[in-house]
């Protein structure tokens, strides 16, 4: 049977995406969560009921938060399962829209495998949430895109959700740790409620700096080339290319990885054995539909380009 080259490329890229490359910013996130988990396990093993604590990860869109959290939770879930605590110790979900107290509760119940009528009142839904968290012995609940908890913009709704999160963490029978990840607006939610903030450890993913992080990005590029079995062209390993790549990714770590993978995909599709600048040029063009004069992998003065813009053309500048 003949294998479709496009399907083969998709599979190879999927395997590369599944591979998580450890980076400096991941280490404090991993260490903080490990401490929280060990404290929670110690309480369970000794039969003590202490309030749980949580972890909040903030950063700009494209900073790589989702990939870091997904890898962290996958690893910790497997570890806890191996130690006999089951495979449902950590529940992860994306904050729904609208992020009302009732809708968040319903979404969490569904993640716990329980369906409920939308006619039920919020207090009843959250009583069920606490019951099922306890019955399934869930240790942590992760809410991704947690900045949306404040999307309705009303203090009342924000206060209600923050209060319920604190209630989960201080439950007198089965306290549950809360993990929040989201954009920098998440910080406003924590600062709005000091009681919630004091129960959270915090990590922030900063934007990259071309001057400070170009070499790190080149190391990352080499690592992906090795896994993809591609030879990096000499010009790709220059400091200038590292700076171009960071700028093209709007200074965001997660977008750097996306661009690298998209360039590798172009090399696979063209059946090239080496990764070169032409693949990055094409990847950026496909991502933004920009003309050559607005492609940071082509022009000399690439810093003048606003890499957050798409459809950039000579007669249509932002």
Regions found by a protein language model. Name each.
Residues 150, 161-236, 240:
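The catalytic "switch" region of P-loop NTPases
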Residues 1-53:
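Walker A/P-loop-proximal flanking segment of P-loop NTPase domains
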Residues 57:
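Hydrophobic anchor at the beta1->P-loop junction of P-loop NTPases
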Residues 65:
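Conserved lysine of the Walker
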Residues 2-22, 210, 218-318:
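C-terminal alpha-helical "lid" subdomain
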Residues 2-5, 100-104, 114-164, 168-175, ...:
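Mid-core helix/loop region of P-loop NTP-binding domains shared across ATPases and GTPases
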Residues 74-85, 113-116:
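Post-Walker A helix-loop "phosphate-sensing" segment adjacent to the P-loop in P-loop NTPases
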Residues 68-72, 104:
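Hydrophobic positions on the alpha1 helix immediately C-terminal to the Walker A/P-loop
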């Amino acid at each position: 049977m003949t294998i479709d080259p496009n399907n083969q490329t998709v599979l190879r890229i999927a395997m590369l995406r599944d591979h998580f490359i450890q980076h400096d910013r991941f280490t404090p996130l991993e260490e903080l969560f490990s401490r929280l988990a060990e404290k929670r396990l110690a309480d369970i093993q000794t039969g003590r009921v202490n309030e749980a604590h949580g972890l909040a990860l903030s950063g700009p869109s494209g900073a790589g938060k989702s990939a870091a959290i997904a890898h962290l939770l996958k690893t910790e879930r497997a570890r806890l399962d191996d130690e006999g605590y089951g495979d449902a110790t950590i529940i992860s979900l994306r904050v729904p829209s609208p992020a009302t107290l009732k809708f968040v509760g319903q979404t969490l119940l569904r993640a716990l495998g329980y369906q409920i009528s939308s006619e039920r009142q919020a207090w009843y839904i959250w009583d069920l949430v606490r019951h099922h968290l306890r019955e399934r012995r869930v240790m942590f609940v992760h809410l991704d895109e947690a900045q949306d908890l404040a999307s309705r913009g009303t203090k009342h709704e924000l206060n209600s959700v923050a209060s319920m999160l604190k209630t989960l963490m201080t439950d007198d029978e089965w306290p549950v740790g809360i993990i929040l990840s989201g954009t920098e607006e998440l910080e406003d939610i924590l600062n709005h409620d000091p009681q919630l903030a004091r129960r959270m450890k915090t990590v922030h993913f900063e934007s990259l700096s071309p001057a400070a992080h170009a070499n790190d990005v080149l190391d990352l590029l080499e690592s992906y080339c090795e896994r993809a079995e591609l030879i990096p062209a000499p010009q790709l390993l220059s400091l200038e290319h590292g700076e171009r790549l960071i700028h093209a990714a709007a200074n965001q770590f997660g977008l750097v990885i996306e661009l690298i993978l998209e360039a590798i995909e172009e090399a696979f599709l063209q059946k090239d054995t080496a990764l070169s600048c032409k693949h990055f040029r094409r990847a950026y063009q496909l991502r933004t539909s920009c003309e050559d004069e607005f492609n940071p992998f082509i022009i000399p003065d690439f810093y003048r380009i606003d890499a957050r813009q798409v459809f950039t053309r000579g007669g249509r500048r932002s």
